[in-house]
Amino acid sequence: MEARLVWGVLVGPLRVLCVLCCLLGHAIAAPSPIIKFPGDVSPKTDKELAVQYLNTFYGCPKESCNLFVLKDTLKKMQKFFGLPQTGDLDQNTIETMRKPRCGNPDVANYNFFPRKPKWDKNQITYRIIGYTPDLDPETVDDAFARALKVWSDVTPLRFSRIHDGEADIMINFGRWEHGDGYPFDGKDGLLAHAFAPGTGVGGDSHFDDDELWTLGEGQVVRVKYGNADGEYCKFPFLFNGREYSSCTDTGRSDGFLWCSTTYNFEKDGKYGFCPHEALFTMGGNGDGQPCKFPFRFQGTSYNSCTTEGRTDGYRWCGTTEDYDRDKKYGFCPETAMSTVGGNSEGAPCVFPFTFLGNKYESCTSAGRSDGKVWCATTTNYDDDRKWGFCPDQGYSLFLVAAHEFGHAMGLEHSQDPGALMAPIYTYTKNFRLSNDDIKGIQELYGPSPDADTDTGTGPTPTLGPVTPEICKQDIVFDGIAQIRGEIFFFKDRFIWRTVTPRDKPTGPLLVATFWPELPEKIDAVYEAPQEEKAVFFAGNEYWVYSASTLERGYPKPLTSLGLPPDVQQVDAAFNWSKNKKTYIFSGDKFWRYNEVKKKMDPGFPKLIADSWNAIPDNLDAVVDLQGGGHSYFFKGAYYLKLENQSLKSVKFGSIKSDWLGC
């Protein structure tokens, strides 16, 4: 097969291509007008969204969900998510409604959960009926097996897979209306749903194949051939001094897409070819043979993969030149630049492409009001109007499946935002089942016999993390900061938010909902108001965000900020409105950072005791509220208020009563 070419084919035009791409990447086009893309779903108005949301998840009938009923039901929804119960469609409520989530209702729905059912046996079978083209079958199998193990680890339930016949849990992927009367809604929105234990559809779990299914951190691409066959692409990877976040044909004369399986290709030389129909197909009856172009189907010649003849939207091709004669076919694998949504049924991006007369060498948000990045799937959008959204981080099939299998065991949605069974999707890198989840499933089935310590044998059971309650517990916050006008309180993987001190903050919410790449626990946080960027510290690294987008190249070591190597942790940091400088505290010392010059000021560190009146060492947090003229230093359960101009302490108070509304 041609794909087994030696790596030397990369080198010839490499430098010319790289220089050309760099020059094109710096071309600046005039802002493009906002247009209507064919096949795009028009966003609902806030009122339309609310009526549909409350009908689907809170039982408010569409035909009678008038203003009075809507307001009452809206309060129930706000209470469920820990939002202020105003009954109004405020910004926080709309933001919550627009988040990706499970399709099961948040209040009792007897089609899904009649009479709190459970399985009457501990040996449960499951069968995977279909696969998503986003992941190779082995990765899908593993994700589902690990998701079921989440529940078998803490209960007597044991799961076994069958390949034929009727299983207790039938697992499948589908789009829109897929046969159970509960249609999906295209990309984002509803991710999956599952039915409670029982006969028929009981236990069945369905996943929306209009989503991009990954392991939560971008596309999972297993390479073929090369010198790293079967390994996974490493994104981004470094090649000839440039980072690539997707497969590329740069440097190749045959057009095949490739990637490095380590970060530094120049150093390690490990690579493979990305899935492509010219290399192989999946499923079907073509034994994995590559597509044969052109091929004939129903008398028509096709030069690319097609969805013709299918109702499920999957792209396929003939593996011989005449499908009508040989009936040999396979499904086209998703490439690392396959699109999601749009009107191209997953066809890959084509670069460069023309849009409104301008050429684009990469994905763009031009023409869109929602900021989503897209690409054309032909060389000229203006002529062909074929397009799709570019791949993002996608949704973790493991996490979504673990949630849905909780429903398949009989669990309903949890109001605990830290629980796996909370309805809104949030990616968690180091997943642990919460105490709320464990209590819920063990109420139905009891604990795992492997964790029984009554006889002194077996492992000691460990409780999952518990969601803190700020007014019932003495919480020492990891960080406090004013970000985009709101005050955020951080504790482990949770945050609380408010606009005004003394008002009880909204929460708890998961940190990952806003800043998904952060570790489970931070040490300090501040906002650089000049650039409106949030800076987070954890251990000997720091992260910089613009809104919810992590800046490229982060996290970075503290040393790149100008701190000495012996500083392994930052206690607190804040930007002082008095001089627009940032102060960073660690132990009994502090440093001053110039946000304009991007370097530490000379003459630091200094001792806290020598410069700050009555401020203790080893602080927990510092914040300077915009326009307030005061700075607040937090330690333990108390805080000290300093007047910015005189540096006099003007108040010593309780965090609970003065900041949390307790």
Swiss-Prot record:
The free-text function statement in the UniProt record for this protein reads: Ubiquitinous metalloproteinase that is involved in diverse functions such as remodeling of the vasculature, angiogenesis, tissue repair, tumor invasion, inflammation, and atherosclerotic plaque rupture. As well as degrading extracellular matrix proteins, can also act on several nonmatrix proteins such as big endothelial 1 and beta-type CGRP promoting vasoconstriction. Also cleaves KISS at a Gly-|-Leu bond. Appears to have a role in myocardial cell death pathways. Contributes to myocardial oxidative stress by regulating the activity of GSK3beta. Cleaves GSK3beta in vitro. PEX, the C-terminal non-catalytic fragment of MMP2, possesses anti-angiogenic and anti-tumor properties and inhibits cell migration and cell adhesion to FGF2 and vitronectin. Ligand for integrin alpha-v/beta3 on the surface of blood vessels.
What is the free-text note on the cofactor? Binds 4 Ca(2+) ions per subunit.
Q: What is this protein called?
A: 72 kDa type IV collagenase
Q: Which cofactor does it need?
A: Ca(2+); Zn(2+)
Question: InterPro entries this protein is in?
Answer: FN_type2_dom (IPR000562), FN_type2_sf (IPR036943), Hemopexin-like_dom (IPR000585), Hemopexin-like_dom_sf (IPR036375), Hemopexin-like_repeat (IPR018487), Hemopexin_CS (IPR018486), Kringle-like (IPR013806), M10A_MMP (IPR033739)
* MF-aspect GO terms: endopeptidase activity; fibronectin binding; metalloendopeptidase activity; metallopeptidase activity; peptidase activity; serine-type endopeptidase activity; zinc ion binding
Q: What is known of its domains?
A: The conserved cysteine present in the cysteine-switch motif binds the catalytic zinc ion, thus inhibiting the enzyme. The dissociation of the cysteine from the zinc ion upon the activation-peptide release activates the enzyme.
Renumbered residue ranges of the record's region Required for inhibitor TIMP2 binding: 414-662
UniProt repeat feature Hemopexin, residue ranges: 474-518, 519-565, 567-615, 616-662
Record keywords, A-Z: Angiogenesis, Autocatalytic cleavage, Calcium, Collagen degradation, Disulfide bond, Extracellular matrix, Glycoprotein, Hydrolase, Membrane, Metal-binding, Metalloprotease, Nucleus, Phosphoprotein, Protease, Repeat, Secreted, Signal, Zinc, Zymogen
Subunit info here reads: Interacts (via the C-terminal hemopexin-like domains-containing region) with the integrin alpha-V/beta-3; the interaction promotes vascular invasion in angiogenic vessels and melamoma cells. Interacts (via the C-terminal PEX domain) with TIMP2 (via the C-terminal); the interaction inhibits the degradation activity. Interacts with GSK3B.
Q: Which residues form the signal peptide?
A: 1-29
Species of the source: Rattus norvegicus
